[in-house]
Amino acid sequence: TPADAGAQEVLIVALRKLGFEVTRLRFGEIENFFAERKGPGKHLCFAGHTDVVPPGEGWSHGPFDGDEQDGVLYGRGAVDMKGGIAAFVAAASRVPGHVSLLITGDEEGEAVDGTVRVLDWMQEHGKIPDFCVVGEPTSKAVLGDVVKVGRRGSLNAVITMQGRQGHAAYPHLAENAVHKLLPALAALAAHRL
């Protein structure tokens, strides 16, 4: 992250051959692009990333070799998520209408100059899609055993609860803010998102 060994360039060449107009979007040190082929109907976007996490130990094949053995492709990023992006390109070549791809080089790292910045650009240029397919791999036990309909995000919040300090000898004069906070936390935990 964010190096992609030329993966975005390969994609850009392939998408231009399919009639896509490509806009390169560099934010900081991060290369991203938005590719669009306008057409009738709703706007469908495929979103993904070309960066990978460091390979770590224990590889049976070179992590950056892209070896194929018994119909299985071995290499860092083959599943997360260059395989998904290859499926996007295959689908985009067959899907009629208004299709785009949002490709970022900053998903595995800090993720501040990738999708968030490209979405801001898309908003500014009137290119927010009606639908988006994110090809991030998800599974319970075996790749492809589940399909998720959304991606859970995260929320950071500061909750302030007022109390009243007091002496241990006079607990009836004190208000413990933690005790007041517990029902609010229970309500938040019970709320289905």
Label every PLM stretch briefly.
Residues 1-55:
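N-terminal helical capping/dimerization or prosegment-like subdomains
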Residues 2, 6, 10, 83, ...:
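Conserved active-site and cofactor/substrate-binding residues in soluble primary-metabolism enzymes
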Residues 20-21, 73-80, 169-177:
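Short alpha-helix boundary/capping segments
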Residues 43-102:
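Active-site metal-coordination/substrate-binding segment of hydrolases
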